UniProtKB/Swiss-Prot annotation:
Active-site residues per Swiss-Prot or TrEMBL entry: 28 (proton donor), 39 (nucleophile)
Disulfide bonds: 20-106, 25-31, 36-45, 58-86, 76-82, 98-120
Annotated protein name in UniProt: Invertebrate-type lysozyme 6
Name of the top EC class for this enzyme: hydrolase
Gene: ilys-6
Pfam families reported for this sequence: Destabilase
GO biological process, one term: defense response to Gram-positive bacterium
SUPFAM superfamilies in the record: Lysozyme-like (SSF53955)
Residue ranges occupied by any I-type lysozyme domain in the UniProt entry: 19-138
């Protein structure tokens, strides 16, 4: 029974994260490959407006042999599957920082996406989270 319950909970978290990814994508770019934009002194690129440091933290998905990290970041950010993999990997890497906050998977994903590894604990990310909830995610 315990194993079955764990499987159901794992499916629910994955499903919530998939819906949440769509809401974050919509909030950041209307889910379009928008290229790079200046964002508080550094560039944010693509579907999820990913910064270079975030791309490095998410494990540099899609980086090709011989490709510079910067070129891979710009390209990956404008490819929906690659960018989604990056956001999901970033969430998986830093979600443990939010243990004990009582926040659901989507709130953790959204607030960390907006505010960095401990974004779930920053009051500055509450407005972003409210915007995600306004898109129908929770």
């Amino acid at each position: 029974m315990f194993v079955k319950l764990c499987g159901i909970l794992a499916f629910a978290v994955t499903y919530a994260s998939s819906d949440c990814l769509q809401c974050i994508c919509k909030k950041e770019s209307e889910c379009k490959p928008v290229g790079c934009n200046d964002d508080v002194g550094s560039l944010s690129c693509g579907y999820y407006q990913i910064k270079l440091s975030y791309y490095k933290d998410c494990g540099q998905p899609g980086k090709r042999a011989g490709e510079s990290v910067e070129a891979a970041w710009r390209r990956c950010s404008d490819e929906l599957d690659c960018a989604s993999t990056c956001v999901q990997s970033y969430y998986n890497r830093y979600k443990k920082q939010c243990a004990g906050t009582g926040q659901g998977a989507c709130e953790i994903m959204a607030r960390n996406h907006n505010g960095g590894p401990r974004g779930c604990k920053k009051s500055a990310t509450l407005g972003y989270w409210n915007g995600i909830k306004g898109l129908g995610c929770s």
